[in-house]
């Protein structure tokens, strides 16, 4: 968990404990909400999990849907949500769910929960993942750092060196490296992560095969 995410989590926890969330809800919830989700899968306990912000558990999804209904939200399609924003119609606030990228667990873990609640969703598929032509570079980076105790990158345009002996050091390296790579070109990012993945013997193609649906799976 990044420092920024920790601050947000602490702030939200404090608001919840004071009861301000209930008092402010009628004034702050607006006409509706769009929940943008990625992975939905059982939690695998691990100390180093920098991409945890991109996943929730099926149990969390179930509780979230129950909570939305109890708060008076109507779960609608994205098309209906857009129509309500344009026309202002609707007697109660709406909630709509979207899932990004096309992860396999959306089908295996999220769909049973969604079907049980009768909730429509919108799936935004990354064609490169479905066609196996793109890489999950942020997950590659996490898995590489999990295996490596030291990171040393000597490139003409990018240099980086740090120890990664424990969860705290690995988290710090991930945050720093992630930030610096995102500031540069996409090709440099992919090249650096590819080099680290090769050093850590990460099967980058197998990672996409294991975590992402292909077009046949998406059609289901």
Label each PLM-derived region with a short phrase.
Residues 1-220:
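Catalytic alpha-helical scaffold of carbohydrate-active enzymes acting on polysaccharides/glycoconjugates
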């Amino acid at each position: 968990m990044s420092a920024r995410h920790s601050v947000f989590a602490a702030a939200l926890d404090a608001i919840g404990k004071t009861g301000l969330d209930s008092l402010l809800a009628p004034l702050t919830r607006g006409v509706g909400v769009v929940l943008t989700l990625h992975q939905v899968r059982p939690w695998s306990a691990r100390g180093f999990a920098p991409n945890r912000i991109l996943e929730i558990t099926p149990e969390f999804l179930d509780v979230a849907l129950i909570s939305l209904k109890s708060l008076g939200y109507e779960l609608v399609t994205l098309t209906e949500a857009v129509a309500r924003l344009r026309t202002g119609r609707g007697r109660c606030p709406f909630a709509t769910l979207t899932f990004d990228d096309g992860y396999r667990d959306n089908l295996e873990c999220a769909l049973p929960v969604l079907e049980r609640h009768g909730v429509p969703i919108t799936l935004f598929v990354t064609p490169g993942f479905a066609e196996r032509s793109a890489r999950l570079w942020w997950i590659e980076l996490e898995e590489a750092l999990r295996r490596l105790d030291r990171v040393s990158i000597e490139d003409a345009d990018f240099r980086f060196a740090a120890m990664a002996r424990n969860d705290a050091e690995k988290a710090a390296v991930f945050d720093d490296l992630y930030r610096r790579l995102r500031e540069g070109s996409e090709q440099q990012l992919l090249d650096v992560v590819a080099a680290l993945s090769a050093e850590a013997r990460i099967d980058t193609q197998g990672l996409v095969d294991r975590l992402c649906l292909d077009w046949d799976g998406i059609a289901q």
